[in-house]
């Protein structure tokens, strides 16, 4: 997972811990009795030789890190991100912003779907304010495509990073007209020694005292995450819901290969269904696989190219489906991370300092 593999903001941590000698080789997890050099918590299939590096309580193996240390790092880093995400979510709810986190593999058609969705929303809900945050490692190509539709967009380039995080989204959102419109009025806040008023000109992610509410959806913020079916699954951005987009050109077993993403999603969109006549893609099997991972997952089939199924997508988005699906997806995601959290208790002794070593000879 990218919290500890080296692509997040704390990418030096694993190497630092490796230098400190905190790595504890896995015991009892190697089935054949023969452990590859430097391996930790790997399960080996005796009949095929296949390696499974997610066998430990942390569900990941990183050279230089014990399983307990890996879990602790994940909790620390994600805990900080989740606090920022909670601020984002509080703001979005207070101002009637429906924030959707679009996640998928590269090339699934996210940006094309966004352009089609923008056109459709303008026809049926011209009153809605729209904005887009684009995430890619490099270039502003996708943001330029969105801006060409007339909708404001901010491009986030993550460099070597493989996902967006809550602070990135907060910083990008502050630069959108959607944010300015939400804060066009002056907020009144009461303190113990009296009242004061101020305008929001500070970092939004750290603002936690909204005292007003908005009824219904007044605007939609689309967040197109970096194309990646692994890392974005565990990073809460403060969104109303995650929407996993799966192209029918990718194969129907993607939900089983990348279960964390589909467990965290409220909705799975099967895109490019106009290509089905030319492919051997079993739609029913794909949906079955996805619901093995997430029984509450809602599924829509559409073609961003032809517009087929887009009306159903808009209905889900604006008629409460996003909110209803988000609660179920949150429960599913919590179940999937329960094992690592429980595992840290069993591995607590690895985090405790060892006995002092006497310097006397």
From Swiss-Prot:
Residues where Ni(2+) 2 binds: 162-163, 231
Binding sites annotated in the UniProt record for Zn(2+): 162-163, 231
GTP-binding in keyword set: yes
Short name of one Pfam family: cobW
Record-level Gene Ontology MF annotations: GTP binding; GTPase activity; nickel cation binding; zinc ion binding
Binding residues for Ni(2+) 1: 2, 5, 7
An example Gene Ontology biological process: protein maturation
Positions of region (G-domain): 99-300
Keywords: GTP-binding, Hydrolase, Metal-binding, Nickel, Nucleotide-binding, Plasmid, Zinc
Keyword GTP-binding: yes
Annotated stretches, region: Disordered: 14-37, 183-213
CDD domains per the UniProt record, alphabetical: HypB
Segments of skewed composition (Basic and acidic residues): 14-25, 189-213
Coiled coil: none
Similarity comment text for this entry: Belongs to the SIMIBI class G3E GTPase family. HypB/HupM subfamily.
Function: Involved in the maturation of [NiFe] hydrogenases. Required for nickel insertion into the metal center of the hydrogenase. Exhibits a low intrinsic GTPase activity, which is essential for nickel insertion.
Record-given protein name: Hydrogenase maturation factor HypB
Gene that this polypeptide is encoded by: hypB
């Amino acid at each position: 997972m990218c919290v500890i593999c080296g692509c997040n903001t704390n990418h030096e941590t694993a190497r630092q811990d490796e230098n400190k000698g905190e790595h504890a080789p896995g015991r009892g997890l190697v089935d054949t009795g023969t452990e590859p050099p430097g391996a930790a918590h790997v399960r080996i299939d005796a009949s095929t030789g296949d390696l499974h590096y997610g066998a430990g309580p942390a569900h990941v193996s990183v050279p230089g890190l014990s399983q307990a240390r890996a879990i602790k790092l994940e909790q620390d880093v994600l805990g900080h991100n989740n606090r920022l995400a909670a601020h984002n979510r509080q703001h979005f709810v207070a101002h009637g912003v429906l924030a959707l986190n679009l996640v998928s593999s590269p090339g699934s058609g996210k940006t094309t779907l966004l352009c089609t969705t923008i056109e459709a929303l303008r026809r049926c809900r011209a009153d809605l304010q729209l904005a887009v945050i684009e995430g890619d490692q490099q270039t502003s190509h996708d943001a330029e495509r969105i801006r060409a539709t007339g909708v404001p967009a901010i491009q986030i380039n993550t460099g070597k990073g493989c996902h967006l995080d809550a602070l990135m989204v907060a910083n990008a959102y502050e630069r959108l007209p959607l944010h300015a419109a939400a804060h066009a009025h002056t907020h009144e806040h009461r303190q113990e020694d009296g009242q004061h008023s101020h305008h929001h000109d500070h970092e939004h992610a750290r603002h936690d005292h909204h005292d007003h509410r908005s009824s219904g959806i007044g605007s939609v913020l689309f967040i197109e995450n970096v194309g990646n079916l692994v890392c974005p699954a565990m990073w809460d951005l403060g969104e109303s819901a995650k929407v996993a987009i799966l192209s029918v050109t990718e194969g129907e077993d993607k939900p089983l290969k990348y279960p964390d993403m589909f467990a965290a999603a409220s909705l799975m969109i099967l895109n490019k269904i106009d290509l089905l006549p030319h492919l051997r893609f079993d739609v029913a099997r794909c949906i079955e696989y996805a619901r093995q991972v997430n029984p509450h997952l809602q599924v829509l089939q559409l073609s961003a190219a032809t517009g087929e199924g887009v009306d159903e997508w808009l209905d889900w988005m604006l008629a409460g489906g996003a909110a209803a699906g988000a609660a179920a997806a949150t429960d599913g995601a919590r179940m999937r991370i329960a094992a690592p959290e429980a595992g840290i208790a069993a591995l607590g002794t690895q985090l405790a300092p060892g006995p002092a070593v006497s310097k006397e000879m």
